[in-house]
Amino acid sequence: MIKITLKDGSIKEVEAGLSIFEIAQSISQGLARNACCGILNGKVEDLRFIVNEDSSLEICTFDSKEGQHAFNHTASHVLAAAVKRLFPQDKLAIGPSIDNGFYYDFDTEKPFSADQLNKLEEEMKKIIKENPEIKRFELPRNEALELMKDEPYKVELINDLPEGEVISFYQIGDFVDLCAGPHLMAVKPIKAVKLLRSTGAYWKGDEKNKMLSRVYGTAFPKKSELDAYLEALEEAKKRDHNKLGRELGIFTTDENVGQGLPLLMPKGARIIQTLQRWIEDEEQRRGYVLTKTPLMAKSDLYKISGHWDHYKDGMFVLGDEEKDSEVFALRPMTCPFQYAIYNSTQHSYRDLPVRFAETSTLFRNESSGEMHGLIRVRQFTLADGHIVCTPEQLEDEFKNTVDLVKYVMETLGIADDITYRFSKWDPNNTEKYINDPEAWENTQNIMREILNHLNIDFTEADDEAAFYGPKLDIQFKNVHGKEDTIITIQIDFALAERFGMYYIDKDGEKKRPYIIHRSSIGCYERTLAMLIEKYAGALPTWIAPVQAKVLPLSDKYADYANEVVEELRRRGVRVEADHRAEKIGYKIREARLERTPYILVVGEKEAENKEVSVRSRKNGEEGAMPLADFVNRIVLEIANREN
């Protein structure tokens, strides 16, 4: 007998050699029916996995993130089975689960039409009704290649696997797919499925490879859950910054400018300017000094920093190393430049910490499949910064950085919408990370200890660190349910040594400083996208590009309308007047659609009494009030940065 420690701490004795599913059955038939996968000794495993020793075990149902992934992963295989039934000539690529659903990539003669998606969805339902058993089996490499010989993408995936790696397959009826799992025991639990859309996607995300047809879908154990999700999806579409941002005149794109290069229109530029001025003032108030550094540098700088070895594919390189005496690259980050500034003068321990901040224009060579609106772009503006400090100052400086981030998130009204992720290295991925296991473990332990001291509730993620050190990622879930990293705080153990950075300690000795890479608000473009979605375009008054709109009832009151505009502008309010010869009702409706916080109607009575008739986004029609009172009110609201 072996001892199984369950999630609630209870211990169950079972025979060795049982599968996770059989252990679930021994606990409860209901639990077994709803089981999607298991977490065995901290690792997600298939329900078919055999347990031979004392272990900790959590049975995951659809209510857990791990369970949802196994559930949707199974649904992706049902989709692939449906495609092979209806379109046997199409070739299989990959079909993972993703947040809130799944996708599968196929090599097709032409993209799937809406009618074909409907037929595939019906075929999936037919397969689910047949309820074939899902079987898992393993094969040696030569037999696996023979089995998949007619599926070129699967052959490539098998050849990519390292020697000795387990090569496993899952079979649904007569459909077989290469897959590591985990999967459900059967397809019957999938009670509701919906194919959402078909798009193009490059094989392995590489633009040099063939464009495949990617089909997105979602699946649930109850139809009511699918209905609720689809309803939420419709609401999300209304809030999507890519749609709203264009409708509200915040940004646009142009195919001649290029993908991933959004054009901020006057309203968008005003919003960014407002946020930028606020952040720069706040950073200076907290002891940061501003820098202004070049947009590019010689490859030599990036070779010292390690970006050339670990990040070159993500950079825009100008020139050819084999032909040109000097090769430059547009900067993907600011750190090497601020290190050069630090090294330009000598520093005593009394000078530390040094806190550099810069509003940096950065460039990253994102692939076309990764770019989205303002969230993933090729040129962006980052509130970047680096703190150079002694080991004794590290925890306080990290805490102060977290305090700044929390203040920014609270002021933006999104503090309750963020989560924290402690991102660590993967010791097996030496191409991505500086290969210094001792330094990694030491720095990760330091960061974990600091996070625990700060009582930060965080999750941990492997293989998500920067190449030079672990990081705390501040995550925000967008309207489509996908988590985006909006801010990172990183502890760097490597670059101070690479750049020869030092300070003189109290004994006159040279010592290596610690470096904290940080941002206060993240990438301004991504933050703007997040705010548009959070507020459905109705940005708080202090952020809104147009804070008040003055509407004269007719041309007779144009002079007074202009007088109101001038007084508001004099007090720093962003205001416009609408002098078009349109009916007042039409102009009010349009101003409301533009999410204008305050609409001020002026006519004969208002002009005579020096008043404005106020309609606020928050309270609706408020009636007439003295102009001076309204000006003081909106100025105070803006100054307090009310949400």
UniProtKB/Swiss-Prot annotation:
Region (Catalytic): 240-540
Record GO biological process: threonyl-tRNA aminoacylation
Annotated binding of Zn(2+), by residue: C335, H386, H517
Record note on cofactor: Binds 1 zinc ion per subunit.
CDD domains tied to this protein: TGS_ThrRS (cd01667), ThrRS_anticodon (cd00860), ThrRS_core (cd00771)
InterPro entries found in the cross-reference section: aa-tRNA-synt_IIb, aa-tRNA-synth_II, aa-tRNA-synth_II/BPL/LPL, Anticodon-bd, Anticodon-bd_dom_sf, Beta-grasp_dom_sf, TGS, TGS-like
Catalytic activities: tRNA(Thr) + L-threonine + ATP = L-threonyl-tRNA(Thr) + AMP + diphosphate + H(+)
Cofactor(s) the record lists: Zn(2+)
Subcellular location(s) of the protein: Cytoplasm
Function: Catalyzes the attachment of threonine to tRNA(Thr) in a two-step reaction: L-threonine is first activated by ATP to form Thr-AMP and then transferred to the acceptor end of tRNA(Thr). Also edits incorrectly charged L-seryl-tRNA(Thr).
Source organism: Clostridium perfringens (strain 13 / Type A)
Domain annotation TGS: ranges: 1-61
UniProt family annotation: Belongs to the class-II aminoacyl-tRNA synthetase family.
Name of the protein: Threonine--tRNA ligase
UniProt entry tagged with the keyword ATP-binding: yes
GN (gene name): thrS
Domain of life per record: Bacteria
Key words of the record: Aminoacyl-tRNA synthetase, ATP-binding, Cytoplasm, Ligase, Metal-binding, Nucleotide-binding, Protein biosynthesis, RNA-binding, tRNA-binding, Zinc
Listed GO CC annotations: cytoplasm
Gene3D superfamilies to which the protein is assigned, alphabetical: 3.10.20.30, Anticodon-binding domain (3.40.50.800), Bira Bifunctional Protein, Domain 2 (3.30.930.10), Threonyl-trna Synthetase, Chain A, domain 2 (3.30.980.10)
